C-alpha cells in the first residue's frame, strides 16, 4: 500500500435516495448522472406519477406511494403513532390532512416510507444521501461520513433540518 493511499479515506459505498416526486425534469437528472451516476446506487421513494422519468430507468430500488389515495399520508403517520392526531393541525404542517393546505405531512411520509424500506435492505452502504429530484448538482463532493453523523448544508438559517440535501451513515 502506498503512503498516498493511507492518507486518502476509504471510498464509501453510497446509496443516493430521492424522495418526493420526480417533477424536476432532465436538467437535475443529467447533473446527477454527471456528478454521481457512476459512483452511487440510486434509490427512489416517490409518488406514482411521472412514470416516464429517466430517474426510474437508473434506479436500483424504487418504492412508490400512491398519491391518488387521500388517506395514504394518514396511514403512514398512524403506522408510527396515532398520537399525532391529538395535536393542533396547522396548515403547511399537516396538509393534506382534513383538507389543510401544505405539504409537510407529505414529505415526512416519504421520509418514513424510505426508512421503512431501507431497514429491510442488507447493510451494504456506508453513506446515504437524502435529497429530491428537482435539484441541480454542481459538484460530485460528498463528505466522508463518520458513524452516527448527519451532514446538512450550512448557511440557510431556517433553524431546522432540510429535506433538500443531507448525508448520513
Feature map (PLM): residue ranges:
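ER/Golgi luminal nucleotide-sugar-dependent glycosyltransferases, focusing on the catalytic module
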Residues: 2-169
Amino acid at each position: 500500500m502506498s503512503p498516498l493511499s493511507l492518507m486518502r479515506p476509504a471510498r464509501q459505498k453510497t446509496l443516493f435516495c430521492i424522495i418526493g416526486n420526480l417533477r424536476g425534469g432532465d436538467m437535475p437528472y443529467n447533473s446527477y448522472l454527471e456528478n454521481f451516476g457512476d459512483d452511487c446506487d440510486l434509490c427512489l421513494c416517490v409518488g406514482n406519477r411521472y412514470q416516464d422519468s429517466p430517474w426510474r430507468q437508473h434506479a436500483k430500488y424504487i418504492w412508490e406511494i400512491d398519491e391518488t389515495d387521500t388517506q395514504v399520508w394518514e396511514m403512514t403517520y398512524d403506522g408510527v403513532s396515532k398520537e399525532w392526531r391529538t395535536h393542533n393541525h396547522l396548515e403547511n404542517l399537516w396538509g393534506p390532512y382534513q383538507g389543510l393546505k401544505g405539504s409537510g405531512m407529505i414529505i415526512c411520509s416519504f421520509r418514513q416510507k424510505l426508512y421503512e424500506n431501507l431497514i429491510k435492505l442488507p447493510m451494504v452502504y456506508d453513506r446515504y444521501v437524502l435529497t429530491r429530484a428537482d435539484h441541480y448538482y454542481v459538484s460530485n463532493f460528498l463528505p466522508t461520513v463518520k458513524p452516527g453523523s448527519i451532514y446538512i448544508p450550512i448557511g440557510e438559517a431556517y433553524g431546522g433540518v432540510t429535506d433538500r440535501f443531507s448525508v448520513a451513515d
